[in-house]
A protein has these predicted regions:
Chain B
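Short, surface-exposed beta-strand/strand-loop-strand elements in extracellular ectodomains
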Residues: 96-110
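Extended, solvent-exposed segments with strong compositional bias
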Residues: 112-133
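N-terminal small/polar-rich segments of proteins
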Residues: 22-98, 130-171
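Sec-dependent N-terminal signal peptides
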Residues: 4-13
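N-terminal signal peptide c-region/cleavage motif recognized by signal peptidases
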Residues: 17-19
Length: 122, 171
């Protein structure tokens, strides 16, 4: 059992993309008419330098949003916080906020990763 | 004298009470369970070329299967969808229509009891396989991809790349 756990630790997150929280929530921003949420993206993929953020409706259609960066470089083994602002008129339609890896160094076949958190009432 | 002793006593009681209340401060232990999904790429995979007209990630064809691991910290909070390639993301100019086939399978799980049904319960639509992650822990997935050039014509020489897309979506 311990050997299995050590094995998991050794191989764990060797090349990983993480996003949290699972269920972010909107709060009123200091800008009138805009709501804001914050998500955290962790980059432990050596083959990925940039991540794109997006807001989508229930059918994964894009929703207009504002962020300081919608495409942001995240160094290996570091994380970035994304503050995402959406007009209050679109809040009801915004269901997902997603981060997508931008692959730049793929030799033959690679894995593009996308993680989506969901806005919902808990 | 008596008044002074009484005053000292009152002050003492107040001090004791004050210090007692200071020691009785509630110390909050808070936690915020936010949950997260982690997609790890264990192996990027490579295409082998068993025939001039075929590229395949199958080890028997000289390729290497892409392997991903998905970790979730909340049960019943995520589904994960894998889409195997239906085109090259980069290639030389092709000389015929290329047909892609692909599949995704669970290759290992961290919780054999609660993840036993992942493979049988998956939903396959075209080249996308979707799994409901009903338990916390890690699941390993292996992906196969084969590209066959039309008319059994040889692939033009050059570098070919294709992506498997892994999506972890909160539900």
């Amino acid at each position: 059992m311990y050997r299995y756990l050590i094995f998991l630790l050794l191989i764990g997150s060797a090349n990983a993309h993480q996003m949290s929280p699972t269920y972010p929530q909107w709060s009123q921003s200091y800008l009138d008419g805009l709501s804001v949420t914050r998500v955290r993206v962790f980059n432990k993929r050596k083959d990925v330098k940039y991540y794109e953020i997006g807001v989508f409706d229930k059918d994964m259609k894009p929703i207009p949003f504002v962020s300081q960066y919608d495409l942001r470089g995240i160094n290996y083994n570091t994380y970035a916080m994304f503050d995402v602002y959406v007009n209050n008129d679109y809040i009801k339609d915004a269901v997902y906020v997603c981060s997508t890896s931008m692959l730049t160094d793929v030799k033959s076949s690679g894995v593009a990763s996308k993680i989506c958190s969901k806005f919902k009432d808990l | 004298m008596i008044k002074e002793l009484a005053l000292i006593g009152i002050v003492g009681v107040i001090s004791y009470g004050g210090s007692k209340s200071a020691f009785a401060l509630d110390i909050p232990i808070s936690a915020s369970v936010t949950g997260s999904c982690v997609i790890s790429v264990e192996t990027n995979g490579t295409y082998g070329q068993p025939y001039a007209y075929k590229l395949s990630t199958t080890p028997a064809d000289g390729g290497e299967l892409p392997i991903t691991r998905v970790d979730v910290t909340l049960a019943d909070a995520y589904k994960v969808a894998f889409t195997t390639p239906d085109s090259f993301s980069s290639s030389p100019t092709l000389n015929d229509v290329v047909t892609f086939t692909g599949d995704t399978e669970v290759s290992a799980v961290s919780d054999a009891t609660n993840m036993a049904d992942y493979e049988t319960d998956k939903v396959e639509v075209d080249n996308t396989d979707t799994y409901e992650l009903t338990a916390t822990g890690s699941t390993w997935f292996k992906h196969s991809s084969t590209a066959t050039n039309g008319g059994d014509r040889a692939f033009p020489s050059g570098n070919y790349t294709a992506y498997v897309t892994a999506e972890c979506i909160a539900i």
